[in-house]
């Protein structure tokens, strides 16, 4: 017998699903049944999601100014709303919590129409479009990097971004500095969808690195499917041992055994780097509408745990110079690793579960905020 059912709404990319996965583990440990509602794009990331059931509803992103494209997207979202309403009416969840992105809009609106309590979790330092639309309509807002003030201060709780159990396990691995002649593990990734820019910039930077330093490198690089073979061939030509793939199921463990990371600065990425505690070169995605990745990066770079390099500045020469500096400064990297860890929030899943449980039990949000204060 469970305490009741909690419905999580997350989709689009792995970045939205990963914190939902972490919350699902915590809620199940507390005796709740957990279901996931997602869209077709996110199904490939949801294979190991710890839910009692996974439901797919139609969804679309409004990312075009073309009137026909907007009309098609709205029609798909309407279909998703009707499907979500039927689903929620049958499941009767205690709470529906959304993790951002357009796929969360149909289930959150359907839940509200049916009188089911709703919560949103905003991972980024800048609230995304879907969550901005939902914010005035939900009972509570949880923030990863959000400031506690603002228009919705009375219903906002800063919980941090939940990280998966694999990340918490990886955080138990101490940082190991790499001295002269020792192997130097470099991890390169661009979020769940990869980063094409890294597939060009990183091999080019390593090509102009001096031979002694290059011989120390051991690389894990996430690359898009269309780039993976080319990147792998470049490293083979340079005689640098490298694992190159569109996806690594053990990325947390690879980060834990690394000396340095090069990555985008999505909210999940920054949160995981903080919990594990690894020095990083963060390259914010330059085309984000709200520049949220730049704001996320500041959360860890401000503590001294990362260096932020705009993509326009990430030339092979700049990156090669950074690699040379860091590979010859193990004490500096060790200090950065400690600084990164100080920015981490390993307790975030528990704090978010506290919020969801408070709402599920019909308690006033002020009771939770008073406890946190």
Curated annotation (Swiss-Prot):
Name the SUPFAM superfamilies on file: UDP-Glycosyltransferase/glycogen phosphorylase
Under the cellular component aspect of Gene Ontology, which terms does the record hold? Answer: plasma membrane
Keywords assigned: Cell cycle, Cell division, Cell inner membrane, Cell membrane, Cell shape, Cell wall biogenesis/degradation, Glycosyltransferase, Membrane, Peptidoglycan synthesis, Transferase
Q: Name one GO molecular function term.
A: undecaprenyldiphospho-muramoylpentapeptide beta-N-acetylglucosaminyltransferase activity
Its placement in the membrane is given as:
Peripheral membrane protein
What CDD domains does UniProt report for this protein, alphabetically? GT28_MurG
Q: In which pathway does it act?
A: Cell wall biogenesis; peptidoglycan biosynthesis
Task: Tell me where on the tree of life, at the top rank, the source sits.
Answer: Bacteria
- Which Gene3D superfamilies does the UniProt entry name for this protein? Glycogen Phosphorylase B
Give the subcellular location. Answer: Cell inner membrane
* GO terms under biological process: carbohydrate metabolic process; cell division; cell wall organization; lipid glycosylation; peptidoglycan biosynthetic process; regulation of cell shape
Enzyme class comes to: transferase
Q: Which Pfam families match?
A: Glyco_tran_28_C, Glyco_transf_28
Q: What is its main location?
A: membrane
Is the Ion transport keyword given for this protein?
no
Kinase as UniProt keyword: no
Sites where the protein binds UDP-N-acetyl-alpha-D-glucosamine: 13-15, 124, 164, 192, 293
Q: What is its EC number?
A: 2.4.1.227
Q: Which reaction does it catalyse?
A: di-trans,octa-cis-undecaprenyl diphospho-N-acetyl-alpha-D-muramoyl-L-alanyl-D-glutamyl-meso-2,6-diaminopimeloyl-D-alanyl-D-alanine + UDP-N-acetyl-alpha-D-glucosamine = di-trans,octa-cis-undecaprenyl diphospho-[N-acetyl-alpha-D-glucosaminyl-(1->4)]-N-acetyl-alpha-D-muramoyl-L-alanyl-D-glutamyl-meso-2,6-diaminopimeloyl-D-alanyl-D-alanine + UDP + H(+)
- Chain's role: Cell wall formation. Catalyzes the transfer of a GlcNAc subunit on undecaprenyl-pyrophosphoryl-MurNAc-pentapeptide (lipid intermediate I) to form undecaprenyl-pyrophosphoryl-MurNAc-(pentapeptide)GlcNAc (lipid intermediate II).
The record's similarity note reads: Belongs to the glycosyltransferase 28 family. MurG subfamily.
Matches recorded under NCBIfam families: murG
What name does the UniProt record give this protein?
UDP-N-acetylglucosamine--N-acetylmuramyl-(pentapeptide) pyrophosphoryl-undecaprenol N-acetylglucosamine transferase
Q: Which organism is it from?
A: Allorhizobium ampelinum (strain ATCC BAA-846 / DSM 112012 / S4) (Agrobacterium vitis (strain S4))
